């Protein structure tokens, strides 16, 4: 396991996407098949793809939507499970022999590469869903031979069945590997539920493995900028090229790439150094020969049954294994925790050499062969990756690792925390954690919120608070926008954001442009006073949080708007949110949640060149919405006048603030002709076909519900005369879903 460690099987001509001999060895990249268009996406690639909102459909889940993983996990004998995993790690199998008779290094690499796909910009990736089982991750060059690691785990999964998910098992295997080596981890939380098809994720625009040109805009200089939201420098790698940028063995240049990519996984310099040093304390890389390995699992012949990268050299395993093409053994205590990585790194001078497979790596200069062979052969000289030497040569990393050389206990503490963060970064709040090994203390990166320590409000309190809100002088749009701003920061990918904690009143969210800080300055003090007045007079130990008041106020506004439209409804409300503090809020970490656009509020920035309708669907994906829910919410929010800045774009009604289906009625009215605005970018004018008078204005966030055939079909449903009530019901249901997205306590 490494920043890429066992990354890239070699092929016969040793060429990569950039056609550079210096990146030898490289995988024989599968090429896109040329064919006539076969799908709608082939014919109309610019059309927004709404199908992404229906991934992970329960129809593909063999357990159905009622399966309760937490209940199944509660039946697990965790001590027996742990003992079985450790026994597996220490028992070499003939079909894939373990280095030094121990699979610790292999399992650490598997767990790291499962978790290491996480990226901060959209919260995608990570170990939380067992995605490594599926393409493309199961066939990435960086994940070569991890198919064997997962296959080794199958007897454990088979034995414990539904009580342990693949996602938890893959993540825990690395934790167990560290513990059985003598390392004391910071704990472990179960609770990852499996998905049953690949996660919807753009890994890059390159069409060859190991390509870099698109994410860097064709630049290869030292100041090149990695495009967002990507977290890796190279297509098919977890982080960086272990031989250095573009295969050029420059440790300082490698350090630059390491810092950027690990930062995009939410790791600082100390955490990054700890992960590399700790992760390379166990295991080795494999590059026994310059041979052409077979195709990856997705391209392998059927008879290989999901195993790929078949190696024709010697036995194809053991000392004849070819994985990355790098042949590096970091320590002589390969299966035991030690400080030997740093002792070797600083106890030797390093000279550049090549592995038997032709990959750039470093070997200890004038050193004796002191590293035991994993299968009893002649001892080896100490070796390091280019990215390992970066931990010494880079001034910042060097200062950190030199300190750890003399104080290994500090390194152990740093690695324990960094490893726990790596394994759990995409799991969301601790309320989702399961098992007996969850640390008692929360870290700030977990976005902690206080536990409920008081009696909750009841139905009569809720009714009284709603009445106070509606008599406060705040308008329906103000209340709806505030509740939406609080809840819509949620990301279903890494379970961050949401209304719980009321972080809308804290930095950085208080001053996000999308949240209209000037409006918040008017609304929040009023809601805070309502909260304070209630808490000062309530009896029976009852209290209400501002987080609850914000959501309750928005729901009260929706009820009023529906009533004004002729529909008596009750918006379901579940109290139990609490208020976070500024001290428990990592401003820098939360900054990546700031919406650059939000089509639900018709918020966008001038000059934005990314299609608004695609960004709207992406926002809906992060909110875990279906296409019907997206459609109902847009129609309702426009009717309620909840646009950013009070803009009239898409407000196709003469009674804003009333919950009606007017948005759909007027969008589909053929008496209106739409044309791009001559005055405003990203704006369209809706003109009366008879008079030429401008009736409405809109953005792509609005017109996509008339232009996209799937969304238009849904819009037509809500425009029907017999579906006005259905629209109100569907809008309210979708509204409640968004308000409760982060209420994991309600889902247990």
Swiss-Prot record:
Description of post-translational modifications: Formation of the three residue Trp-Tyr-Met cross-link is important for the catalase, but not the peroxidase activity of the enzyme.
Residues with site note (Transition state stabilizer): 109
Gene Ontology biological-process annotations: cellular response to hydrogen peroxide; hydrogen peroxide catabolic process
CDD domains: catalase_peroxidase_2
Enzyme class: oxidoreductase
Cofactor list: heme b
Source organism, top-level taxon: Bacteria
Binding-site list for heme b: 280
Cofactor note: Binds 1 heme b (iron(II)-protoporphyrin IX) group per dimer.
Pfam families referenced in this protein's UniProt entry, alphabetically: peroxidase
Keywords: Heme, Hydrogen peroxide, Iron, Metal-binding, Oxidoreductase, Peroxidase
InterPro entries in alphabetical order: Catalase_peroxidase (IPR000763), Haem_peroxidase (IPR002016), Haem_peroxidase_sf (IPR010255), Peroxidases_AS (IPR019794), Peroxidases_heam-ligand_BS (IPR019793)
Positions of the catalytic residues: 113 (proton acceptor)
Keyword Mitochondrion part of the UniProt annotation: no
Catalytic activity, reaction form: H2O2 + AH2 = A + 2 H2O; 2 H2O2 = O2 + 2 H2O
Region (Disordered): 1-40
Per UniProt, location of the Tryptophyl-tyrosyl-methioninium (Trp-Tyr) (with M-265) cross-link in this chain: 112-239
Record's keyword annotation contains Hydrolase: no
Annotated GO MF terms: catalase activity; heme binding; metal ion binding
Basic and acidic residues composition bias: residue spans: 1-14
Tryptophyl-tyrosyl-methioninium (Tyr-Met) (with W-112) cross-link site: 239-265
Family under the similarity heading: Belongs to the peroxidase family. Peroxidase/catalase subfamily.
Stated name of the protein: Catalase-peroxidase
Organism whose genome encodes this protein: Mycolicibacterium gilvum (strain PYR-GCK)
Gene label: katG
């Amino acid at each position: 396991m490494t920043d890429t460690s066992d990354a890239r099987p070699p092929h016969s001509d040793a060429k990569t996407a950039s056609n550079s001999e210096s990146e030898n060895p490289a995988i024989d990249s599968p090429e896109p098949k040329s064919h006539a268009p076969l799908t709608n996406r082939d014919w109309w690639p610019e059309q927004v793809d709404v199908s992404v909102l229906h991934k992970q459909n329960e129809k593909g889940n063999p357990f159905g939507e009622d399966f309760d993983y937490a209940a199944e996990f509660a039946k697990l004998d965790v001590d027996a499970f742990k003992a079985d995993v450790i026994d597996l790690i220490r028992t070499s199998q003939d079909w894939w022999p373990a280095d030094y008779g121990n699979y610790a290094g292999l399992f650490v690499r598997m767990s790291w590469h499962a978790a290491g796909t996480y990226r901060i910009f959209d919260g995608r990736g990570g170990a939380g869903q067992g995605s490594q089982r599926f393409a493309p991750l199961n066939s990435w060059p960086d994940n070569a031979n991890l198919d064997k690691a997962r296959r080794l785990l199958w007897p454990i999964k088979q034995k414990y069945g539904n009580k342990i998910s693949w996602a938890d098992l893959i993540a825990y295997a690395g934790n167990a590997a560290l513990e059985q080596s003598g390392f004391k981890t910071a704990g472990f939380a179960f609770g990852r539920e499996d998905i049953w098809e690949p996660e919807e994720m753009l890994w890059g625009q390159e069409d060859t493995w190991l390509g870099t040109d698109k994410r860097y805009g064709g630049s290869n200089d030292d100041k090149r900028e990695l495009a967002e939201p990507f977290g890796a420098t190279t297509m098919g790698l977890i982080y960086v090229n272990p031989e250095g940028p573009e295969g050029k063995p420059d440790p300082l240049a490698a350090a630059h790439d390491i810092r950027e990519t690990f930062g995009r996984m939410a790791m600082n310099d100390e955490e990054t150094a700890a992960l590399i040093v700790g992760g390379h304390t166990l295991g080795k890389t494999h590059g026994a020969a310059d041979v052409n390995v077979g195709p990856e699992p997705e391209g392998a012949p059927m008879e290989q049954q999901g195993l790929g990268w078949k190696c024709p050299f010697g036995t194809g395993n053991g000392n004849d294994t070819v994985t990355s093409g790098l042949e590096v053994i970091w320590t002589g205590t390969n299966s035991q925790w030690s400080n030997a990585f740093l002792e070797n790194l600083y106890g030797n001078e390093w000279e550049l050499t090549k592995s038997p497979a032709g990959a750039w790596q470093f070997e200890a200069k004038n050193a004796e062969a002191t590293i035991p062979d994993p299968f009893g052969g002649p001892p080896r000289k100490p070796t390091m990756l280019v990215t390992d030497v970066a931990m010494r040569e880079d001034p910042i990393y060097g200062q950190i690792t030199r300190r750890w050389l003399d104080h290994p206990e500090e390194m152990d503490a740093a690695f324990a925390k960094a490893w726990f963060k790596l394994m759990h970064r995409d799991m969301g709040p601790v309320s989702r954690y399961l098992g007996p090994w969850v640390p008692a203390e929360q870290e700030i990166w977990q976005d902690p919120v206080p536990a409920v320590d008081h009696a909750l409000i009841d139905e009569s309190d809720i009714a009284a608070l709603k009445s106070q809100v509606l008599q406060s002088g705040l308008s329906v749009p103000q209340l709806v926008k505030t509740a939406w701003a609080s809840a819509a920061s949620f990301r279903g990918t890494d379970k961050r954001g949401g209304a719980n904690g009321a972080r809308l009143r804290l930095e950085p969210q208080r001053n996000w442009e999308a949240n209209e800080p000037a409006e918040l300055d008017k609304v929040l003090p009023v809601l805070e006073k309502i909260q304070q007045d209630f808490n000062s007079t309530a009896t029976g130990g009852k209290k209400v949080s501002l987080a609850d008041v914000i959501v309750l106020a928005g729901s009260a506004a929706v009820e009023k708007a529906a009533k004004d439209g002729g529909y008596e409804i009750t918006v379901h409300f579940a109290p139990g949110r609490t208020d976070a503090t500024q001290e428990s809020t990592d401003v820098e970490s939360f900054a990546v949640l700031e919406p650059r656009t939000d089509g639900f509020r018709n918020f966008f920035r001038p000059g934005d060149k990314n299609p608004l309708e695609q960004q709207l669907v992406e926002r809906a994906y992060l909110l875990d919405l279906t296409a019907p829910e997206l459609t109902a919410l847009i129609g309702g929010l426009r009717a309620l006048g909840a646009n950013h800045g009070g803009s009239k774009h898409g407000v196709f009604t003469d009674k804003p603030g009333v919950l009606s289906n007017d948005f759909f009625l007027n969008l589909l009215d053929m008496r209106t002709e739409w044309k791009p605005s001559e005055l405003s970018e990203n704006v369209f004018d809706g003109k009366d076909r008879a008079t030429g008078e401008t009736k409405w204005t809109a953005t792509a966030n609005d017109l996509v519900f008339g232009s996209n055939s799937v969304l238009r079909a849904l819009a037509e449903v809500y425009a029907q005369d017999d579906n006005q009530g259905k629209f109100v019901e569907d809008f309210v249901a979708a509204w409640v879903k968004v308000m409760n997205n982060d209420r994991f306590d309600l889902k247990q």
